[in-house]
Swiss-Prot record:
It comes from Prochlorococcus marinus (strain MIT 9303). Pfam families: Anticodon_1, tRNA-synt_1, tRNA-synt_1_2, tRNA-synt_1g. The gene is leuS. Its EC number is 6.1.1.4. A motif ('HIGH' region) lies at residues 56-66. This is Leucine--tRNA ligase.
Length: 878
């Protein structure tokens, strides 16, 4: 039964001065009273649809990127409801993390209180947008009733052998004596707080074995046909599956010492002129000669202060030193020097590479810098020359200077040399991955505690499930100094071992916030479950997510971790599917008008630019560059959503941000275009106000979601044209909102329909006009939900517009009785005539020759030729 809505006596609001704030506030209260946005219990055979935006970090202030993300998802959710689906459209908060901890330190406040305050502020801002979110399912990752289950899932992964602890490199601040996140290290490698030069240290860290799923993560990308190709490519490159060979180089003078390298180019083995170890490689200490000890130690100390990014940057010089050892090239017995270098990383492959400078650009640069031999072993195809002396040849070719393997193609050489090496025991085929296991340890306070206890007797002991959650202590010292804040809380750290009862201590690391965001989409399906993180049957009914919307910046980490979690939980029989998101839409950035001084790189506030036609720096007078860049405070180009809503209303903000650009493209903010959308909505108000029910029908009149039932034979030409425009709009907008979603062109079609109705409603029968307006209002409802609700009420619609069905095309309305035919004479267009849509060529020729156009331009001549393009034109050639 449809619940009653406000009476039509309130309809005067739309015909009076448009006051979006009053109108939108009124309808938002009504929707809340009615509970329209709650997720329904799906009826038998009713299709479920899960629409989800990537949930935000609660900074406390909404920005235009948020608005675009959530409005896109809201339109999709509203359309699916009107199509008859049971829709789940939730929202939550990615609430743990470094920003809240830093804010708490700076302001001397509790990060939990700070975060809850921000959540309340942002929810109020989101509510103003008219989003149809089921807030009953709201989750915050920092709340105990959520992170209890993050810990539960960690223990599941631990039980499955997917969580483990090992030593890893971290950023260490030697002054504050604490671990820093990468974001806390500036471009010069210094701590953001103390200014100290950051060191690289080895600490025990927790990892998840995401590499166990490397093949599944890359192979299953082919099944994600609803994902952008760009995202799938980015993930494949990040996983970085490489097929090659593992080669063993024996250390000269030592019987049992072997350096193992992985290479994707075993065909170039004869061209190896040195072997390079990572400075952290365990063999460096053992193989370094006494003569090189000082140089090697100094180099290792230098490298320990550099980040991985600095060590591997393409524009950085490739530094290294020899360690005084030699290895034997197994394919030809040559002795090769062993070096350590900054560009080789210990945790990639075996931490050792063979240097083939003629056929690897990085090796080429290193060899040139250190005067190492460069031997060509691959000749360029179809060329007598091997390659340009100024660079490495990394492409395919024919093997030369390779002994028995000369003349083979590179692909043949890879197989032949690997096979030969395998028969001799020094080579084997190998698949290598760029992907590393996921380091989840953070030496921070504001994160999910890792539910592990360390016991001297029992080792690593999981916290019993009945003792979850392991909660964060409150009123803790957050000075940002002295290592992990949790490690300072002895009352919290010291516990008894659950197994032996002896003294033990808690794990003081907290989890990476990506742990919390890797499963939140599952909790939304069963948010109040107090026994488990979610019920398998319920989750399997709603998931995978039908439509996921978020920024391209999450293409790798968040989306990859969520896919890993889903696969791991599937293998633990906790869920029945292997991929979390069926369809992914990555919306573009919102960019603002930006003024930049190209001489010094500074950004200038638009408020300081006096002449927009000739913008100049107010201090130097330098001419300013005008461009659009991602909105940010530092560029003075941000637009506050609250200001836009206060002035124009949420419907205008929604319409602009949906209309300005296709959803996946960057959007350039333009105040004039915002004003244009506001004027369009005002035109719609005037259009609706121009429709008046006849006096005889007024008391019982009610607009319907049903199509017109009058026979087309009984319709006037005006009525036929109005119905055709109406149903063409249904066809076009339905297409725009299906598959490859194009919200901007859908709004264009809305504009076309409204223009076609303008000034014509009083020229057709009430039933025809009412059908057209019913369609118009229903088509606009997902985009401008407040005004659509107001219009529906004014037109005496029953219930809420958002409870109505999506318009259905009447194919008969699209059938053309007549068409416009172009008449050409001597190939030039001379005019058009109306002809029956089903006229054949003979009839078209006859109608064309009898037309006034032909009489005028042929001047009594008979055409020598008549060229007919059915449905398009007739060309008369005298």
């Amino acid at each position: 039964m449809t619940e009653s809505f406000p009476s039509t006596s309130a309809s005067s609001h739309s015909s009076a001065r448009y006051d979006p704030i009053e109108l939108e506030t009124r309808w938002q209260k009504e929707w809340l009273r009615q509970g329209l946005d709650r997720t329904p219990v799906a009826e038998t055979n009713q299709k479920r649809f899960y629409a989800l935006s990537m949930f935000p970090y609660p900074s406390g202030k909404l920005h235009m990127g948020h608005v675009r993300n959530y409005v896109i998802t809201d339109v999709i959710a509203r359309v699916q409801r009107m199509r008859g689906d049971a829709v789940l459209h939730p929202m939550g908060w990615d609430a743990f993390g470094l920003p809240a901890e830093n804010a708490a330190i700076a302001r001397n406040v509790d990060p939990g209180d700070w975060t809850d305050q921000n959540i309340a502020q942002m929810r109020a801002q989101l509510d103003r947008l008219g989003l149809s979110i089921d807030w009953d399912r709201q989750q915050a990752t920092c709340h105990q009733d959520y992170y209890r289950w993050t810990q539960w899932l960690f223990l599941e992964l631990f039980a499955g052998g997917l969580a483990y602890q090992k030593e890893a490199t971290v950023n260490w601040d030697p002054i504050d004596k604490t671990v820093l996140a990468n974001e806390q290290v500036d471009g010069e490698g210094r701590s953001w707080r103390s200014g100290a030069l950051v060191e690289q240290r080895q600490l025990k860290q927790w990892f998840l074995r995401i590499t166990d799923y490397a093949d599944a993560l890359i192979d299953d990308l082919d099944e994600l046909t609803g994902w952008p190709e760009r995202v799938r490519t980015m993930q494949a490159n990040w996983i970085g599956r490489s097929h090659g060979a593992e080669i063993k180089f024996r250390v000269a003078g030592q019987t049992n010492s072997i350096i193992t390298v992985f290479t994707t180019r075993p065909d170039t083995l004869h061209g190896a002129s040195y072997v390079v170890l990572a400075p952290e490689h365990p063999l460096v200490e053992a193989l370094t000669s006494p003569q090189q000890r000082i140089a090697v130690t100094a180099f290792c100390d230098l490298i320990s202060q550099l980040s991985v990014k600095d060590r591997t940057a393409e524009d950085q010089p490739k530094r290294g030193v020899p360690i005084g050892a030699q290895v034997i090239n197994p394919v030809n017995g040559e002795s090769l020097p062993v070096w350590i270098a900054d560009y080789v990383l210990a945790d990639y492959g075996s931490g050792a590479v063979m240097g083939v400078p003629a056929h690897d650009e990085r090796d080429f640069i290193f060899a040139r810098s250190h005067e190492l031999p460069i031997r060509i072993v691959v000749q360029m195809p179809d060329s007598d020359e091997h390659h340009n002396d100024g660079q490495a040849w990394t492409g395919a070719g024919v093997l030369v200077n390779s002994g028995a393997f000369d003349g083979l193609s590179t692909e043949e050489g890879k197989v032949a040399i690997t096979t030969h090496g395998a028969s001799k025991g020094w080579a084997q085929s190998k698949v290598q991955y760029r992907l590393r296991d996921w380091l989840i340890s953070r030496q921070r306070y504001w994160g999910c505690p890792i539910p592990i206890i360390h016991c001297a007797s029992c080792g690593i002991v999981p916290v019993p499930q009945e003792d979850l959650p392991v909660t964060l202590p409150r009123d803790i010292d957050l000075s940002g100094k002295g290592g992990s804040p949790l490690a300072q809380e002895q009352d919290w750290v010291e516990v008894k071992c659950p197994i032996c009862g002896e003294k033990a201590h808690r794990e003081t690391d907290t989890m990476d916030t990506f742990m919390c965001s890797s499963w939140y989409y599952l909790r939304f399906a069963d948010p109040l479950n107090s026994q488990r993180p979610f019920d398998k049957d319920i989750v399997d009914e709603w998931l995978p997510v039908d439509q996921y919307v978020g920024g391209i910046e999450h293409a790798i980490l968040h989306l990859l971790y969520a896919r890993f979690f889903t696969k791991a939980l599937h293998d633990r029989n906790l869920i029945g599917f292997k991929e979390p998101f069926n369809t992914l839409l990555t919306q573009g950035m919102v960019q603002g008008l930006t003024y930049r001084n190209t001489k010094n790189g500074s950004y200038i506030s638009p408020e300081l630019v006096s002449d927009e036609g000739d913008p100049r720096d107010p201090e130097s007078g330098d001419k300013l560059e005008i461009l659009f860049e991602k909105m940010s405070k530092s560029k003075y180009n941000g637009v506050d959503p609250a200001v836009v809503i206060d002035r124009y209303g949420a419907d205008t903000a929604r319409m602009f941000i949906l209309f300005k650009a296709p959803p996946e493209k960057d959007l350039e903010w333009d105040d004039a275009d915002v004003e244009g959308q506001f004027r369009f909505l005002q035109r719609l108000i005037r259009l609706i106000d121009s429709f008046v029910w006849p006096k005889t029908d007024e008391d019982n009149a009610s607009i319907s979601s049903a199509n017109l039932t009058i026979s087309s034979a009984d319709l006037s030409e005006e009525e036929i044209n109005m119905r055709r425009a109406t149903h063409m709009a249904i066809e076009a907008i339905t297409e725009d909102l299906s598959g490859d979603i194009q919200l901007n062109t859908a709004i264009s079609e809305l504009m076309k329909l409204s223009n076609s109705l303008g000034g014509k409603l009083d020229k057709v029968r009430t039933e025809v006009a009412a059908e057209a307006l019913s369609v118009l209002v229903r088509l606009m409802a997902p985009f401008a939900p407040h005004l659509a609700e107001e219009f529906w009420m004014k037109l005496h619609g029953q219930g809420s517009i958002h409870q109505q069905s999506w318009p259905i095309i009447d194919p008969s309305a699209l059938v053309l009785e007549t068409i416009e035919l172009v008449i050409q004479v001597k190939g030039k267009v001379r005019g058009t005539i109306q002809v029956p849509a089903n006229a054949d060529k003979t009839a078209l020729e006859e109608l064309a020759l009898k037309s006034d156009i032909a009489v005028k331009w042929l001047e009594g001549q008979s055409p020598r030729r008549v060229i007919i393009v059915p449905g398009k034109l007739v060309n008369l050639v005298p």
